[in-house]
């Protein structure tokens, strides 16, 4: 457990010691909130469903950007061999890196708290739906993070890791759409619903 915490601190600190982490947070919050605000003024209701409808597609792009450097950066900075010589299991290393990326993602998602705050000032939105939407987004983000860390471990280049993770996340996004589900249901009854 001590090894997991040390890797967690090291990697989480790396997100916030460079401006890249802050830029990522600002861009994600700006795009996600901006898309919601434009929809909100088109259909003025105290509802966050349009916000959560857009998030999976945004996560398909932003999560690979977070995970592409996780293992590739270790190889580039020649710290890969040093990490392997530490007295820790590979699972501890992976869990520490995953938790660091997940906490960074959760903090980024927490920065979007302005959206429900705005809704509560304008009306009476459903708190359960908002909490459920954020919880579902955290789970989807954790899944995409796991995919990104997996593919980053196989790729030596950050860009290749980004593209492979992006395409895989997008494939899973498409599988969840109504169009693909109805197509699967036509071919194999009951599987798409």
Show which residues each predicted segment covers:
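Long, hydrophobic alpha-helical segments
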Residues: 53-73, 108
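Terminal transmembrane helical anchor/hairpin motif
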Residues: 45, 164-193
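Helix-loop-helix units of permease transmembrane domains in multi-pass membrane transporters
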Residues: 70-100
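Secretory targeting signals
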Residues: 35-37, 48, 58, 100-160, ...
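Aromatic- and glycine-rich beta-strand/loop motifs that create alpha-glucan
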Residues: 1-21
């Amino acid at each position: 457990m001590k090894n997991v915490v040390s890797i967690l601190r090291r990697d989480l600190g790396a997100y916030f010691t460079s401006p890249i982490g802050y830029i990522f947070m600002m861009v994600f919050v700006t795009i996600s909130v901006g898309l919601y605000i434009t929809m909100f003024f088109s259909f003025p209701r105290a509802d966050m469903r349009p916000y959560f409808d857009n998030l999976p597609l945004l996560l398909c792009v932003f999560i690979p950007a977070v995970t592409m450097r996780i293992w590739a950066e270790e190889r580039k900075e020649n710290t890969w061999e040093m990490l392997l010589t530490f007295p820790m299991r590979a699972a501890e290393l992976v869990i520490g890196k995953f938790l660091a990326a997940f906490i960074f993602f959760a903090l980024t998602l927490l920065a979007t708290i302005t959206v429900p705050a705005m809704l509560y000032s304008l009306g009476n939105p459903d708190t359960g739906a908002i909490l459920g939407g954020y919880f579902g987004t955290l789970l989807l983000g954790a899944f995409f993070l796991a995919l990104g860390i997996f593919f980053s471990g196989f790729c030596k280049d950050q860009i290749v890791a980004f593209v492979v993770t992006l395409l895989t996340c997008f494939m899973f996004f498409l599988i969840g759409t109504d169009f693909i589900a109805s197509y699967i249901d036509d071919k194999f009854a009951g599987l798409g619903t």
